[in-house]
């Protein structure tokens, strides 16, 4: 199996699948679908690599930052930059200037490639970085150049910022070996998809699938697809704006999609209301394990869909647990170890992972690195779980979210949130410590607040004294989430 970027481009793209479609997207100006084959993609990667090598002095190890919505050039710049010897850095272009400027100062970019859209801090970007700010297709008029196999598999190649829910993001340092260790899991997932497809449609001999990429490419969950989908010569159908979800999906048939909770719920409603035709043949929603209600997942399965769930972190390059279960009770699980790294539950029940998937560390933060990776190389995920007799792991809660009371008891906010969400009037909620009390921030309609309070009163009667919710705040507006749809706790 290919185990490096150079071979992925020169062997897989240029020799194995040159004529297959690598990318599709809808051109907004015309509403038509544009395509790039793997041969065209590889030529543009060669253009980009040549441009970076010529225009970034002493390019080796220099930072190239991408600030852009999902687009074809994102993939070109990713491989072009690292093949030239630079370090590729992805960032959330929609962050407020306070956060974005902090991340940029940490990364010290030699070059910032952007899509030209003003996300609210264009003036500050231009004032701070001037000539270092260039368009995503800056290389378009450059002749394709030669490529060298020179990436050190154990050296820093890519930096991605964590989508934190409790504080500042950290810059995760990943090497080439991290990505290609994880490819073993992704290739196996692809085999599972083909097996399901051929069992459902035995007359369909087509082994080429396509993935609808709606989640942002700056996040590992989508970014990893730039590496994994070329392995089988499959296509990424890019969507850059959630508002165009149904338009783009209708124009580009897609088999698979990685989804956040809000989008999974939308797909579920379409299926349950007899509007599956809006999904244009989509049959494989893939999401982060334990983020979805099992009733929702089972409803999709009953209507012919195949659910895949993955548990991982940016710090493990997305590697971790995989769940192919399509029925209770295992559909609620995080999944099983994928078999390509080592996994264990420590004495506290925390999931720990060791192997080629584990990051190099947090950039310029050795203290935080030492807190998460122990002296024996085990990465401590911060997630608490239990294992059943079939080898499935089930989420218990986040270690850092535990509310530790003055009496010594530990309270899992996730468990209380699950119970609160059983109230029909609760749209969403976050349980956290509020002034030494267990508190709940609840989104619901103003006229429903009394009913929610009554529900909490009844719930408290069923809970031990130390678990009872004694502080409640309401919001008529949706609670804040990060870029991947996770509720913020800060």
Task: Please tell me what each predicted stretch does.
Residues 18-21, 144-161, 167-168, 198-210:
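Conserved pre-ATP/AMP-binding loop-to-beta segment of ANL
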Residues 112, 355, 360-361, 384-467, ...:
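AMP-binding/adenylate-forming catalytic core of the ANL superfamily
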Residues 79, 83-150, 436-451:
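Structural core segment of the AMP-binding/adenylate-forming
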Residues 255-259, 267-329, 342, 427:
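Gly/Ser/Thr-rich phosphate-binding loop
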Residues 36, 49-95, 214:
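Conserved AMP-binding/adenylate-forming
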Residues 35-39, 157-185:
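Conserved AMP-binding A3 loop
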